[in-house]
Swiss-Prot record:
InterPro entries: Flag_bb_rod_N (IPR001444), Flagellar_basal_body_rod_CS (IPR019776), Flg_bb/hook_C_dom (IPR010930), FlgC (IPR006299). The gene is flgC. This is Flagellar basal-body rod protein FlgC. Keywords: Bacterial flagellum. Belongs to the flagella basal body rod proteins family. PANTHER family: FLAGELLAR BASAL-BODY ROD PROTEIN FLGC, FLAGELLAR PROTEIN. PROSITE patterns: FLAGELLA_BB_ROD (PS00588). The lineage of its organism: Bacteria, Pseudomonadati, Aquificota, Aquificia, Aquificales. GO terms for biological process: bacterial-type flagellum-dependent swarming motility.
Amino acid sequence: MMDIFNALDISASGMYAQRIRMNTVASNLANYESFKSDGTPFNRLVPVFEAVENLEDPSEVYVNVREIREVPGFKLIYDPENPNADERGYVRLPNIEPVKEMVDMITAVRSYEANLKAFSLTKEIFERTFEAWK
């Protein structure tokens, strides 16, 4: 049976995962037009999550960040004045779409808030139960 602390741990793991997601989106937006030191475009980063079962109770599942994956690819624009332009005048830009990143950010924030609400409600139930036992 799930105890109160496991419920708090599950909500906390969800908040952790969404915080990683928000940080990844922020990094993508910050590097929207960035290049690596070798002149290649910054690759979009995407967190990869995995479900981890509680070994003591398989009905309890936590969220874990398995890795932060680079998504290869780029956009081509014509800008012959750019120092990173190729011999035809095209520049490879990062494969980051700001609108998609903002949608991902909004989704991550809402998921974080839902986990925070679940955490807060669980804590409140615990506090009220403890008060009733006094």
